[in-house]
UniProtKB/Swiss-Prot annotation:
Subcellular location as annotated: Cell membrane
Any Pfam family matching the protein: DUF441
Phylogenetic lineage: Bacteria, Bacillati, Bacillota, Bacilli, Bacillales
Record-given protein name: UPF0756 membrane protein BH3161
Transmembrane segments: 1-21, 54-74, 87-107, 117-137
PANTHER family for the chain: UPF0756 MEMBRANE PROTEIN YEAL
Cell membrane recorded as keyword: yes
InterPro entries registered for this protein in UniProt: UPF0756_TM
Family, per entry: Belongs to the UPF0756 family.
Lineage: superkingdom: Bacteria
UniProt GO cellular component terms: plasma membrane
């Protein structure tokens, strides 16, 4: 008998294929393979505990790679800070990183939010031609929205 978890993963696999979401497709396939070869009991807890941190580390490596390769150096940084657009980008990068930090805590403390974020991302990609920016920023935005709703509720509650 196929478990509910496997059926859910197969549904996500179909959605990933329909939405042409490569990241979701790879993630679902990796998890299904781990489950089917019987090492899920050992691997899944590790992913749950360390997965987000490892993912953030990989993203950070990708962001720092142009510095390591020499594509971005002090000269480019100096040129960039002379542009008003660069200052907007710098501020945006700071804000997004701070929002995403709140998302990490939300994902760790409220794992069912991950499912809603994945479904929202899939919907946006499949229906609205959106871009999957990842669950951290989505969780961060959700966290901020929840805090604003709580704050507004304190006036009317």
């Amino acid at each position: 008998m196929i478990s509910q978890a496997t059926i859910f993963m197969l549904v996500l696999l179909v959605i990933a294929l329909l939405a042409k979401n490569q990241s979701l497709l790879i993630a679902v396939l990796v998890l299904l393979v781990i489950k089917f070869i019987g090492v899920g009991d050992k691997v899944f807890p590790f992913f749950q505990q360390k997965g987000i941190s490892l993912g953030v580390t990989i993203i950070t490596i990708a962001v720092l790679t142009p510095i390591a390769t020499g594509e971005i150096g002090f000269k480019q940084m100096g040129e960039a800070i002379r542009s008003s657009y660069a200052w907007v980008a710098l501020l945006s990068g700071v804000v997004v990183a701070l929002i995403a930090a709140s998302g990490i805590d939300l994902l760790k403390n409220d794992p069912h939010i991950t499912t809603a974020l994945v479904l929202g991302t899939i919907l946006a990609v499949a229906v609205f031609n959106g871009v999957a920016v990842g669950p951290l920023i989505g969780a961060g935005i959700a966290y901020l929205t929840m805090k604003v709703v709580q704050w507004l509720g304190s006036f009317w509650g």
